[in-house]
């Protein structure tokens, strides 16, 4: 299989430009402003240039890779393409595509380098325009190569799929000698048949089946008897097929000479192209026998035709495509000979010089070998006597065999009679057929748990238990735990409890409890915690406690809650200034008490620094924005309002009423 039919279409130069530029316009952003940063403007236009270059390279690479590489093709396909399309012209066209691809990549690199130094949007735009313009100019110059490659693609898709390695029959000869008629007769190929020469201008392929094997039949154009240099493209296709295909060659000759060429000329053509028949099976087919028989020829001409078979490599066959006389015989004979020849070639190729059969040949022989009995005796068909004497069932015969259907009809018919499904059960004891044992119990198959030796196994287990009881096996208390094991178990349980407590305390510490995480430096620790920690370290804390309490006493401020009311015990008595009170105390009592200030600012608790505080406020506003936009009363508001208020959408939308809806 060549895969030439899967080559995608090659666009023309103008179509190629439209594809590339429209793809660039569709796939990339299209808006840019002079006020943007110059780096952003450069990146915008650099991306356009590089994207266009990548698109061109991708398209050109796809075109180059889709066409076959001549050096990788079979010699037949390589020479056929050389004849039809001129291999040099084909290579030059693909080379121009590859050169254009490299030039476009060079242009892209140069203009990307220039775009790095552009100072304005106008400069970037002009550089981009120049780069894309140069790329488009290069593509326009590929007008002729692209048209040529698309024509080659179309012609390749129309070529027949010829397999050079399969079983092949190759039909050759002068024009109008009946080659296409033979191919139409033995295959389903619709080859053109007309009463004039050179009806077939290219290779046609048909397929036939012989002994469950597929053969391909190739109809070649007619060949004229002149030097190879003077042959045209149509004739060279036939010569290429004869030279490179391992096939059985059927050389057709028109002995009635109605083709316009004499029998002598047909014999001379056979001799001139005979070097192309090397290592091939050759058959001369004498066609149009219904018009003129071989025996009606001149003795000299008969002798010349018979001389062609002296080498032993050529056979003469006779047929008439008009009356189908001898056509199937020719087909069967050639296919059989070709099959035998291919098998012998495989056997010869798989045998080593020392006569041993290779591994590959053994695999092939294993596939084609048919096993037969070694003793040579004939094994006839054996039919038991009971089968021979078996009478045909007759419903009206009283001595007929009684079938289950007869029993059913005798006992009430279908729906009344229950078929005995256990009747034909094969059990060790026929009495077991009707035991009340369910097939399925608790969703399990009962038969899977039935053991024929279960009674013997149960008896053995009971005897073993009695023996163990007599030996005192169950009197030992080794399994009871001692004091050491109980102590180990208690310690293990205590360790598990401690681990659980530690884990729970860690979870409680880490949980926020609906509070913000306060930094360690902002947490105020009591003096008692400090004293406990220092006591654990062995530091005397008496002096530290006295100093802290003294600082606390000095920093205490505010009015005393108890005012001196002299010596009277009456709570309603008038305040009297004691002469012993200092002026400082009197001044403090005369001032009004200020509002109490909270110990900490809850709004700023847990947020350290102005930057973090402003960031937290912005995030809070951002979280609140959606709720405000959707007019929610809070986070728990899930009310869904009417999507189409009836007072706004009722009535008909008449002409002139849709501008307000």
From Swiss-Prot:
Q: What is its main location?
A: nucleus
In alphabetical order, the GO MF annotations are: GTP binding; metal ion binding
Q: Does the keyword GTP-binding apply?
A: yes
Stretches of Low complexity bias are at: 555-566
Protein residues bound to Mg(2+):
180, 200
Q: Which UniProt keywords apply?
A: Coiled coil, GTP-binding, Magnesium, Metal-binding, Nucleotide-binding, Nucleus, Ribosome biogenesis
What InterPro entries does the entry give? Answer: G_OBG, GTP-bd, NOG1, NOG1_N, NOG1_Rossman_fold_dom, NOG_C, P-loop_NTPase
GO cellular component terms, semicolon-separated: nucleolus
Region Disordered: start-end pairs: 549-578
Keyword Magnesium assigned: yes
Q: Secretion signal: which residues?
A: none
Q: Name one GO biological process term.
A: ribosome biogenesis
Q: Which family does it belong to?
A: Belongs to the TRAFAC class OBG-HflX-like GTPase superfamily. OBG GTPase family. NOG subfamily.
- What name does UniProt use for this protein? Nucleolar GTP-binding protein 1
């Amino acid at each position: 299989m060549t895969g030439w039919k899967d080559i995608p279409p090659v666009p023309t130069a103008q179509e190629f430009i439209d594809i590339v530029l429209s793809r660039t316009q569709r796939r990339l952003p299209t808006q840019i402003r002079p006020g943007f940063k110059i780096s952003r403007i450069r990146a915008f236009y650099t991306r356009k240039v590089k994207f266009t270059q990548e698109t061109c390279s991708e398209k050109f690479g796809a075109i180059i890779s889709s066409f076959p590489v001549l050096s990788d093709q079979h010699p037949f396909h390589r020479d056929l393409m050389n004849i039809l399309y001129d291999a040099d012209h084909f290579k030059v066209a693909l080379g121009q595509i590859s050169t254009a691809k490299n030039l476009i990549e060079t242009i892209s690199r140069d203009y990307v380098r220039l775009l790095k130094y552009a100072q304005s949007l106008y400069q970037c735009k002009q550089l981009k325009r120049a780069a894309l313009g140069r790329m488009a100019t290069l593509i326009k110059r590929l007008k002729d190569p692209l048209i040529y490659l698309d024509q080659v693609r179309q012609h390749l898709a129309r070529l027949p799929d010829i397999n050079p390695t399969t079983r092949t029959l190759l039909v050759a000869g002068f024009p109008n000698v009946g080659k296409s008629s033979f191919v139409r007769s033995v295959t389903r190929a619709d080859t053109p048949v007309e009463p004039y020469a050179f009806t077939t201008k290219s290779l046609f392929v048909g397929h036939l089946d012989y002994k469950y094997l597929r053969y391909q039949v190739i109809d070649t154009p007619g060949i004229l008897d002149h030097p190879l240099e003077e042959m045209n493209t149509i004739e060279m296709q036939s010569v290429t097929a004869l030279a490179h295909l391992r096939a059985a060659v059927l050389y057709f000759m028109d002995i009635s000479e109605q083709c316009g060429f004499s029998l002598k000329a047909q014999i001379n053509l056979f001799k001139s192209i005979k070097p192309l028949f090397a290592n091939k099976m050759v058959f001369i087919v004498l066609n149009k026998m219904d018009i003129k028989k071989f025996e009606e020829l001149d003795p000299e001409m008969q002798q010349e035709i018979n001389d062609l078979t002296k080498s032993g490599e050529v056979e003469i066959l006779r047929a008439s495509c008009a009356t189908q006389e001898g056509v199937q015989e020719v087909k069967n004979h050639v296919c059989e000979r070709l099959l035998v020849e291919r098998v012998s070639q495989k056997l010869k190729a798989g045998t080593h010089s020392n006569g041993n059969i290779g591994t590959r040949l053994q695999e092939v022989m294993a596939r084609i070998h048919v096993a037969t009995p070694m003793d040579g005796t004939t094994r006839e068909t054996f039919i038991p006597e009971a089968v021979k004497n078996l009478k045909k069932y007759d419903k009206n015969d009283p001595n007929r065999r009684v079938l289950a259907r007869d029993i059913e009809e005798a006992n009430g018919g279908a729906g009344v009679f229950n078929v005995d499904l256990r009747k034909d059960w094969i059990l060790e004891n026929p009495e077991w057929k009707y035991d009340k044992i369910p097939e399925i119990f608790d969703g399990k198959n009962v038969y899977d748990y039935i053991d024929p030796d279960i009674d013997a196994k149960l008896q053995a287990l009971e005897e073993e238990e009695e023996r163990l009881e007599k030996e005192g096996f169950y009197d030992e208390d080794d399994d009871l735990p001692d004091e050491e094991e109980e102590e180990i178990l208690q310690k293990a349980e205590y360790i598990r409890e401690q681990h659980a407590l530690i884990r729970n305390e860690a979870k409680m510490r880490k949980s926020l409890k609906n509070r913000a995480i306060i930094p360690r430096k902002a947490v105020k620790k009591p003096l008692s915690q400090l004293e406990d920690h220092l006591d654990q370290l062995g530091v005397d804390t008496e002096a530290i406690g006295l100093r802290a309490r003294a600082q606390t006493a000095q920093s205490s401020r505010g009015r005393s809650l108890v005012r001196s009311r002299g010596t009277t015990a009456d709570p309603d008595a008038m305040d009297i200034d004691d002469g012993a009170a200092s002026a400082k105390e009197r001044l403090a009592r005369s001032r009004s008490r200020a509002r109490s200030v909270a110990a900490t600012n809850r709004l700023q608790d847990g947020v350290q620094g102005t930057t973090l505080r402003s960031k937290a406020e912005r995030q809070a506003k951002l979280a609140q924005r959606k709720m405000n936009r959707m007019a929610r009363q809070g986070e728990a508001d899930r009310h869904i309002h009417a999507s189409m208020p009836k007072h706004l959408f009722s009535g008909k939308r008449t002409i002139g009423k849709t501008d307000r809806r």
